[in-house]
Amino acid sequence: MAAAGPGAALSPRRCDSDPASPGAQSPKDDNEDNSNDGGHPSKRRRMGSGDSSRSCETSSQDLSFSYYPAENLIEYKWPPDETGEYYMLQEQVSEYLGVTSFKRKYPDLERRDLSHKEKLYLRELNVITETQCTLGLTALRSDEVIDLMIKEYPAKHAEYSVILQEKERQRITDHYKEYSQMQQQSTQKVEASKVPEYIKKAAKKAAEFNSNLNRERMEERRAYFDLQTHVIQVPQGKYKVLPTDRTKVSSYPVALIPGQFQEYYKRYSPDELRYLPLNTALYEPPLDPELPALDSDGDSDDGEDGGGDEKRKNKGTSDSSSGNVSEGDSPPDSQEDTFQGRQKSKDKMATPRKDGSKRSVLSKSVPGYKPKVIPNALCGICLKGKESNKKGKAESLIHCSQCDNSGHPSCLDMTMELVSMIKTYPWQCMECKTCIICGQPHHEEEMMFCDVCDRGYHTFCVGLGAIPSGRWICDCCQRAPPTPRKVGRRGKNSKEG
């Protein structure tokens, strides 16, 4: 056979690894074998054409057997209660995605080692084998794995989504089958005669639910927050509407000029009519309590101190504007009290007083009132009963009308006149004392008490700038109800006596 020229085609070389062709090994292979026999470390052999063909066959076989189906990729919940989260095993995810070193390629994923209880739980679900229970397994968050599959492995994610849909469809089918079996097992039939009764029960339960819902709306969810205006909307209150005839405006509702006719007029009480000069006036004109007469000098106070009580009983008027009666022996005290009385009268003129309706309610005594009776009461100061006071003498106790406090009048430094007065109305102790005008117990530092009846008053409620010094008597005690004095008729028909 002639030698082949340079342009001739080379004959195909038989593979060295073919067992049918006993070809001699190359010198390089002999050297490597000798080196291995000599005890030197073996070197990695470069693959020839025959080795490459063998590796191709082996890799194709590995690929055919290394395919991991999406059905085997399990997502589980741990802990299995309501607080659990969904996880996947890193080993299953790496096999499904075909990533050898999954942890090195994706180090940012959140991962944790499985606990022994978690491995037993997965073993009961047939997710892992007994051999895998002894190995170290790693769990990944399922949401992070799904996001990774969507971004980098869309084909794998589509395949896995199909499997999830099939599992959900199968779950619904199984649930429907169980329900159908339960319906078949319950062969009990409803009698036609009991249908109206069942309808009534259902309507009653619906009515109860609706009533509870409406009550909850009215009591707990009345207001709501408007997202557009950022305003809390509250339902408008219901108002009583008067009939039309009660709200109809008359032809002359109010006078536009003085003396013009109007249908509005004031109704006077019989007591007020007795003071009016309508030719039938029965009482003399009363003094104005808002503008009392001022004292000219301090001597008049000293002269009137002795007979002040008798004059107040006869006239029913006060000697000072604030009701501050001075009983001091020295002239400087009386002059100081006189100056205070004048200053208080100026304050009264500048400060609007309370209306007369509130003051008219204040009376010296409550008709038919009986003080409280506590049999085994003890004095809050000496801690003794009515058998003996702090001086060892028998003395009856006085009791607060609002609490259980009691006390001896001698322990409270009360006179017999004061005790007889406080028994005529609901008396209050120092802890329960309230203002007679406003009825509030606050501002104790501005609370003062009458020396005759022990009632409490705020300084600002009676028009005083500060608590007066010395003896103070309230308007209720110093302005006794006037004794009407009848006078003769005035006018043409009046007879002169």
Curated annotation (Swiss-Prot):
Record's compositionally biased regions (Basic and acidic residues): 344-358
Modification sites for Phosphoserine: 11, 35, 49, 269, 296, 300, 326, 330
Region (Disordered): 1-61, 284-367
Region listing for SAY, in residue ranges: 88-294
Biased composition regions of type Low complexity, renumbered to the chain: 284-295
Stretches annotated zinc finger (PHD-type): 378-435, 437-480
Chain positions covered by the region annotation Essential to induce neural progenitor proliferation: 88-184, 291-333
Keyword Transmembrane helix: no
MF GO annotations: chromatin binding; histone acetyltransferase activity; transcription coregulator activity; zinc ion binding
Biased composition regions of type Polar residues, renumbered to the chain: 317-327
Biological-process GO terms, alphabetical: embryonic brain development; nervous system development; regulation of transcription by RNA polymerase II
Main localization (coarse): nucleus
Similarity-based family: Belongs to the SAYP family.
Function according to Swiss-Prot or TrEMBL: Involved in transcription activity regulation by chromatin remodeling. Belongs to the neural progenitors-specific chromatin remodeling complex (npBAF complex) and is required for the proliferation of neural progenitors. During neural development a switch from a stem/progenitor to a post-mitotic chromatin remodeling mechanism occurs as neurons exit the cell cycle and become committed to their adult state. The transition from proliferating neural stem/progenitor cells to post-mitotic neurons requires a switch in subunit composition of the npBAF and nBAF complexes.
PANTHER family according to UniProt: HL01030P-RELATED, PHD FINGER PROTEIN 10
Official protein name in the record: PHD finger protein 10
Source species of the chain: Rattus norvegicus
The organism's taxonomic lineage, starting at the top: Eukaryota, Metazoa, Chordata, Craniata, Vertebrata
Gene name of the record: Phf10
